[in-house]
């Protein structure tokens, strides 16, 4: 879905420092918007890919249907420069094109008129990049299972879907009418992709075509393939189809481990609304890398263990109460797949909310106390290396702190609001209001401001644009206490709760010193409820 992108200018020192990073023409071509991109809206991808496992090679065709939104004779489609373009056809004729890094500028030699719907056929081939450590670096993973059969996957978030198929590789545009994915692979293997299975057809020369269809809009990086000796089992839950594809050798383990899907769905649908891609169903697919939120075909590689490969990211032991990959990657169906950021600089919209869903699931199943310990335990993973929001227009993500700090920011805002009924309604309404939309940070802040009837903008700005946490300062003046906030943003008045002599009191500090009306004998009498507010104290 093509949306007009809105950029928020922030004159903070940290953003200015970030802007001093060096970006190239290649970065701008990938991350930026220009007339060759904004002049058309992708309506549908019809992708056919033949994979040769032995050669680690593919031959592909993507039929790209698009609507012209501005008169143009040139459009930009993306395909990594190591991949060969065999031809690009329009109405049966070959088109001229120019390549610049991974961008392909296609010249129609005539003006495409605004309002028309057009289609090109993009034929390509080559050996796609092989990932060194998927999913953290993008590419294909060619391995074998225990029985020596090919086991193949691909993950490209951050790197770009154009690593393996031609597309308009920008988060600002998703195919409005979905996609078809046809996988031509050697006989004896199963090909799995997004959406609904539409049947398989045995071809000549030892190959079979596996056909899949997605009805909903879908992120480019969510379109994927899985190839392996899969067995399939299925279930239903509240009218939602649940499908599972796992290696033959792991069926027994999967039938036990995947029982967590139903209580997860109960929790997430209660808190965030109905599963957003019911028409396409929900799938878990075993893969040869840790995991990825591929829409309606979630990649699962957690080795059938609780926690994160058997470890607890929070060091509280509560992270071992659930399968991290099932919960986290499925949470992305609401936050990241249904609600998508326009620019990767705003990826906290995906990762901060989804990291928070882990604590939400714990709270649903095991109670608020365990959830609170878990989310606070995640703070140990924060690096404070750079701001959460990256640089716009150059395919630049911010700090990985978008996960844990982003989740703790939401936890803090929940306690600022101080009304759980209102908080859960806000989260639910947020997921529904922006369902299947592409948004930016400005839209998120505006929504929470409106629904909370509070000005949360300074809080969002401090956590998202700066590495420093809000610092609460105290000083004792004779028998009285004074307190204030120290922050990077100019105006900051976040309320906070303290305990003093067994009583819970809400303070409303600003950046100016304020006098605490109760007498105290020592600063040690004050306990700031840090488990509810992610802050520093001095």
Kindly give the residue locations of the regions a language model identified.
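Amphipathic alpha-helical substructures
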Residues: 276, 399-477, 481
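Acidic/His/Gly-enriched intrinsically disordered linker/tail segments
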Residues: 215, 347, 351-409, 416, ...
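Surface-exposed beta-strand/loop patches in extracellular or lumenal glycoproteins
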Residues: 61-82, 166-171, 175-186, 442, ...
């Amino acid at each position: 879905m093509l949306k007009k992108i809105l950029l928020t200018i922030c004159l903070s020192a940290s953003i200015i420092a970030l802007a001093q990073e060096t970006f190239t023409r290649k970065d701008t071509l990938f991350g930026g918007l220009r007339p060759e991109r904004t002049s058309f809206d992708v309506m549908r991808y019809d992708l056919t890919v033949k994979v040769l496992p032995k050669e680690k090679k593919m031959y592909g065709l993507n039929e790209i249907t698009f609507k012209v939104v501005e008169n143009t004779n040139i459009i930009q489609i993306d395909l990594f420069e190591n991949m060969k373009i065999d031809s690009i056809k329009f109405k049966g004729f070959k088109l001229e094109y120019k390549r610049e890094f991974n961008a392909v500028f296609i010249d129609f030699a005539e003006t495409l008129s605004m309002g028309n719907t057009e289609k090109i056929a993009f034929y390509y081939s080559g050996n796609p990049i092989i990932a060194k450590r998927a999913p953290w670096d993008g590419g294909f993973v060619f391995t074998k299972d225990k029985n020596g059969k090919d086991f193949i996957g691909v993950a490209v978030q951050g790197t770009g879907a154009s690593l393996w198929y031609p597309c308009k590789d920008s988060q600002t545009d998703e195919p409005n009418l979905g996609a078809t994915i046809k996988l031509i692979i050697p006989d004896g293997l199963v090909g799995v992709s997004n959406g609904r299975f539409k049947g398989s057809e045995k071809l000549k020369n030892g190959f079979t075509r596996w056909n899949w269809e997605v009805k909903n809009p879908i992120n480019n990086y969510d379109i994927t393939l899985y190839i392996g000796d899969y067995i399939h089992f299925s279930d239903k839950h509240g009218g939602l189809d649940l499908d599972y594809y796992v290696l033959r050798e792991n069926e027994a383990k999967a039938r036990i481990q995947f029982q967590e899907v139903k209580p997860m769905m109960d929790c997430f649908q209660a808190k965030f609304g109905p599963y957003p891609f019911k028409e396409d169903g929900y799938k878990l697919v075993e893969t040869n890398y840790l995991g990825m939120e591929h829409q309606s075909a979630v990649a699962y590689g957690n080795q059938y263990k609780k926690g994160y490969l058997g470890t607890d990211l929070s060091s509280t032991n509560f992270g071992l109460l659930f399968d991290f990959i099932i919960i986290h990657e499925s949470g992305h169906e609401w936050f990241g797949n249904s609600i998508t950021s326009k620019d990767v600089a705003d990826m906290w919209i995906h990762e901060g909310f989804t990291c928070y869903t882990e604590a939400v699931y714990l709270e649903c199943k095991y109670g608020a106390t365990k959830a609170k310990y878990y989310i606070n335990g995640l703070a140990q993973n924060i690096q404070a290396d750079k701001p959460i929001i990256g640089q716009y227009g150059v395919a630049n993500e911010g700090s990985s702190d978008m996960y844990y700090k982003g989740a703790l920011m939401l936890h803090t805002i929940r306690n600022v609001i101080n009304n759980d009924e209102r908080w859960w309604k806000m989260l639910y309404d947020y997921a529904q209001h922006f369902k299947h939309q592409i948004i930016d940070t400005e839209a998120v802040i505006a929504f929470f401001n409106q629904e909370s009837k509070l000005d949360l903008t300074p809080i969002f700005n401090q956590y998202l644009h700066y590495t420093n946490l809000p610092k609460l300062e105290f000083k004792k003046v004779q028998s009285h206490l004074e307190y204030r906030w120290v922050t990077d943003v100019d105006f900051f008045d976040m309320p906070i709760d303290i305990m003093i002599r067994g009583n819970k009191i809400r303070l409303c500090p600003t950046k100016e010193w304020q006098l605490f009306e109760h007498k105290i004998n020592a600063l040690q009498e004050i306990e700031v409820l840090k488990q509810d507010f992610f802050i520093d104290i001095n």
